UniProtKB/Swiss-Prot annotation:
Gene Ontology cellular component annotations, sorted alphabetically: cytoplasm; MLL1 complex; nucleolus
Protein keywords: Cytoplasm, Nucleus, Phosphoprotein
Annotated transmembrane regions: none
Annotated protein name in UniProt: Testis-expressed protein 10
Biological source species: Pongo abelii
Annotated positions of the Phosphothreonine modification: 29
Function: Functions as a component of the Five Friends of Methylated CHTOP (5FMC) complex; the 5FMC complex is recruited to ZNF148 by methylated CHTOP, leading to desumoylation of ZNF148 and subsequent transactivation of ZNF148 target genes. Component of the PELP1 complex involved in the nucleolar steps of 28S rRNA maturation and the subsequent nucleoplasmic transit of the pre-60S ribosomal subunit.
Coiled-coil annotated residue ranges, if any: none
PANTHER family assigned: REGULATOR OF MICROTUBULE DYNAMICS PROTEIN, TESTIS-EXPRESSED PROTEIN 10
Length: 929
């Protein structure tokens, strides 16, 4: 067969007979098998070096899946990363670079679910990564964000705004450092640039127009609202960062030189006198000079590119304003078309009103940035020249704006047409919008242009006054705008009648009850600012507002009512009262004098219920009181001794009262003295005793209680005070000692003191231990050779001295609270016995041991032994040697029937050493008093 014939046989068609099946081919594939899918929920092989999630995937596995072509795999990898990093947070620091590079790369992914997972992961990671850690990688993050914001896909642009929200919240300083690129991106999100040849030579403000994208799922107005909200947040972060930078400029870092600071120097004179406080007067007076440098570390933008100035330069700010303001005006016109404008007073729907609010917020922030850089007011003039006409035409034509709410009626009457019901409400939207607009407009006005702008300024003034007087509840943001506009109006139009009207309107709002703390604080600061401005003027041009005087006069009463219910607000009131009192404001001082009894009440007054800092300011206010009557001094004394004031504040109060007394050395006439000498001495003695007359009277009925020490040899019982009360009383008494010591005529001073002791303390049967100790202390301080001690006082001192010594000798080791009193009380007892030998003799004469029970006899013996051993008393003990010898003899007689104890042996030994063994002998020293 030829080759040609063979080729033909290959292509011959096989003829099949009817009813017979087609024969199977030799290479036919069987298709009768069944298949099942294989699902691997986790890896079989585990990696022990890296932590894994519930699917046994570690960080490297998950990051590698980010490059997969399938969107579901990438989404699963992002969710797995979130799960893994939530279980093992330490992985973030180790793999931060890889995590950020992979996560930010999917900002522009075409799948919406992948982008959503990336945004959720970034929101989870951002709070866990510090700004210092993020800073090296932020150029990469910013580049991907910029790429997403300028992407041609609408969904990617929308998701980029979510990423921007996260970065603005967590890293405002880093994101605003890239402002040059991001601000341009904001512009491109809502507009496009005209590239026609006719616009080449025109300015840049006319080359950008709003863009409309019909393919976007949102309306053009909704999309612009989203972008404008983010732009407002971005400019707010930029303004905050710029203000912080300006505050820190030129100041030395505290870490570099802790001695150099711009704050006030607080000097504690007590510590300074003891060389415990170092005071550096001059900033560069230390060993480390202040090096003020303008050097700043720039961001790692790569290459040799310069620092991103953004809007920090005036030229850049002007350029951005020229581009964005026309676009914002277009947004405004789109929200409120002039051809469809309803009459003034009719409402605007919520969505257009929100667009208008964001437009004004952005303009207000741009104005704020311009004020931070406009030192010569050139930029302010430029803004007025270029934009005042447009603002008046578009913004003020329908001022003020209101919100229209659409209410749907029920279809009960189908024949009647359903009409929209317009509802006016004091909603935050329209009120804040009107206030922001007022703030922008008044910033463009000044005193020189008042005649030209009087029409729209009067509109704003009327709106501000009505808003303040209508009694509506304002939040702090609204009130801050409102007070800012009011202040600016008073500056540009310093008319007394108009200013008084505005102040009266603010005072009407201030008188409302139930205002929240931020609102009340803003009102206080506003009035304080007005008052300080008035005080800075010369007396010739000073205008005292009647409303302001009424406000000042009401502050002390407000403080008395407020008390501790709001300590922060009370502190602000005290600061304002202190400022006005220091300037001798008559109305305030008169009101403060009338309210002083309530403020300085020892039970519920502000001086005892507030924290330490406002307490100190209230104590300082005592210096400015016009008069200090006896009832007020009595309350101040109770404040000192009750422990509600610290001992240092009590000492400060005592020092202030001394400075306002006739003994301070100031040359006053008798009618100008704030308090009489009798009242001043009464205050000092009441503070010295530490207890009121009523409290001492109640103590006299105490018997047989653990806090009362009773002896068989002394008629005076000792009341044991708590340790805290004892120490506080002791510290306060030190200040009383100092005030008494500086009073001239020491003998007269001592006579007044011992007369008070004889009148109020002598005759009492129960005396507090702190009172007895302080009385001994003040007598020892004041006693000199010119002083004569009263005969009625000596027995009382002797009885108190024995009671104190008995208490000290019977303190058990377990009573740690009373052990801390031992040194102080022992010192004053020994001092009083050394200075007044007659007190020692009277105490020895009272030791009639035949009346003493067996439990008190060892205490008497121990007391005699200690008195003999104490060097300052040795001479006086020699003088009373016969009396001491008789007491020891009586003790020995009482103990003759039993075995001699150790304390009696020690007593005999000390008597033989210090009395019998003395060269002169006891018989030669027998002196009869």
């Amino acid at each position: 067969m030829t080759k040609k014939r063979k080729r033909q046989d290959d292509f011959q068609k096989v003829k099949l007979k009817v009813g017979k099946k087609k024969p199977k081919l030799q290479n036919a594939t069987p298709t009768n098998f069944k298949t099942k899918t294989i699902h691997l929920p986790e890896q079989l092989k585990e990696d022990g070096t890296l932590p894994t999630n519930n699917r046994k995937l570690n960080i490297e596995d998950l990051l590698s899946q980010m490059h997969h072509y399938n969107a579901g795999v990438k989404q699963s990898a992002l969710l797995g990363l979130k799960d893994l990093l939530s279980q093992y947070p330490f992985i973030i620091d180790a793999h931060l670079s890889n995590i950020l590079s992979e996560v930010t790369a999917v900002f522009t992914d075409k799948d919406a679910n992948v982008r959503l997972a990336a945004v959720q992961l970034l929101q989870f990671l951002a709070p866990k990564i510090r700004a210092e850690q993020m800073s090296p990688f932020f150029p990469l993050v910013s580049a991907h964000l910029s790429s997403a914001m300028t992407h041609i896909t609408e969904g990617i642009q929308e998701d980029s705004l979510k990423v921007l929200d996260i970065l603005l919240e967590q890293y405002p300083a880093l994101i605003t450092g890239r402002s040059s690129i991001l601000l341009k991106n904001f512009v491109e999100l809502i507009s496009h640039q005209q590239l026609s040849k006719g616009l080449i030579n025109r300015d840049r403000s006319q080359s950008w127009i709003l863009s409309v994208n019909p393919n976007r799922r949102l309306t053009s107005q909704q999309w612009r609202l989203k972008v404008l909200v983010r732009l407002s947040k971005f400019l707010q972060a930029l303004a905050d960062g710029s203000s912080r930078l300006r505050e820190s400029e030129g100041l030395q870092e505290q870490k570099e030189n802790p001695h150099a600071t711009s704050n006030s120097i607080f000097i504690n004179w007590k510590e300074h006198a003891n060389d415990q406080q170092h005071i550096q007067v001059y900033e560069n007076g230390g060993s480390q000079p202040n090096v003020s440098s303008q050097f700043r570390l720039r961001y790692l933008v790569g290459g040799l590119s310069g620092v991103d100035e953004g809007l920090s330069s005036t030229e850049n700010l002007k350029g951005f304003i020229e581009i964005i303001i026309p676009l914002l005006i277009e947004c405004w016109v789109e929200a409120v078309p002039p051809q469809l404008a309803t009459p003034v007073g009719n409402g605007i729907e919520r969505e257009p009103l929100q667009v208008m609010q964001q437009v004004l917020n952005i303009i207000s922030l741009l104005w704020k940035l311009s004020k931070q850089q406009d030192e010569t007011h050139k930029l302010e003039s430029w803004l007025r020249k270029n934009y005042l006409i447009d603002f008046k035409h578009h913004f003020m034509s329908r001022f003020p704006y209101a919100l229209k709410e659409i209410t749907k009626h029920k279809r009960k009457e189908p024949n009647k047409s359903i009409k929209h019901c317009t509802v006016f409400s004091n909603n935050i939207d329209h009120l804040l919008l009107n206030l922001t607009l007022s703030d922008i407009m008044v910033s463009l006005a000044n005193a020189s242009t008042l005649q030209k702008d009087c029409s729209w300024i009067e509109m704003i003034r009327k709106f501000v006054t009505e808003t303040l007087e209508d009694g509506s509840r304002l939040n702090s943001k609204q009130l801050n705008r409102l007070l800012g506009v009011s202040w600016r109006l008073m500056q540009i139009q310093p008319n007394r009648e108009d200013t008084e009207t505005l102040i009266k309107a603010v005072y009407t709002l201030y008188q409302q009850r139930g205002l929240i703390l931020p609102v009340r604080t803003l009102l206080l600061k506003f009035f304080s600012k007005i008052y300080q401005t008035e005080e800075l003027r010369s007396c010739r041009f000073r205008y005292r507002s009647k409303v302001l005087s009424r406000w000042l006069a009401g502050l002390p009463l407000q403080l008395a009512h407020l008390g501790s219910r709001n300590p922060e607000l009370s502190t602000q009131l005290i600061d304002m009262i202190h400022t006005a009192a220091a300037r001798a404001n008559k109305e305030l001082l008169k009101s403060l004098q009338a309210t002083a009894l309530r403020i300085y009440d020892p039970q519920e007054g502000a001086v005892v219920v507030l924290p330490a800092d406002p307490q100190q300011r209230l104590v300082q206010l005592v210096y400015f009181l016009p008069s200090l009557p006896a009832d007020l001094l009595s309350r101040l004394s109770r404040c000192c001794i009750m422990g509600r004031l610290s001992s240092s504040l009590a000492a400060m109060l005592i020092g202030i009262l001394h400075m306002r007394s006739s003994f301070s050395g100031w040359k006053y006439s008798a009618k100008d003295w704030l308090m009489s000498d009798v009242d001043y001495f009464s205050f000092l003695f009441s503070t010295l005793t530490g207890f009121s007359k009523e409290e001492l009277t109640r103590l006299q009925s105490l018997r047989g209680v653990p806090h009362v020490i009773q002896t068989q040899l002394s008629p005076v019982l000792l009341y044991l005070t708590d340790l805290d009360q004892f120490l506080h009383h002791w510290d306060v008494t030190e200040a009383v000692f100092h005030s008494l010591l500086v009073i001239p005529a020491r003998s007269q001073n001592f006579d007044i003191l011992q007369s008070a002791i004889s009148k109020h303390l002598v005759g009492l049967t129960v005396i507090p231990d702190s009172t007895a100790g302080c009385v001994f202390g003040v007598i020892c301080k004041l006693l000199d050779h010119t002083c004569i001690v009263s005969e009625t006082l000596l027995p009382f001192l002797a009885s108190c001295c024995y009671s104190l010594l008995y208490f000290l000798l019977t303190i058990e080791k377990g009573e740690a609270e009373h052990l801390r009193k031992r040194d102080k009380l022992w010192g004053v007892c020994v001092s009083i016995l050394a200075l007044l030998p007659r007190v020692l003799r009277l105490m020895l004469q009272s030791l009639r041991v035949n009346r003493v029970g067996p439990e008190e006899l060892p205490v008497v013996g121990q007391l005699l032994r200690l008195l003999l051993q104490h060097a300052p008393l040795r001479t006086h003990m020699l003088t009373n040697a016969i009396l001491v010898q008789q007491i020891i003899k009586n003790i020995t007689t009482l103990k003759s029937g039993s075995v001699q104890e150790q304390w009696l042996t020690d007593l005999h030994y000390c008597f033989n050493v210090y009395i019998t063994g003395h060269p002169q002998g006891p018989s030669a020293l027998a002196t009869v008093y």
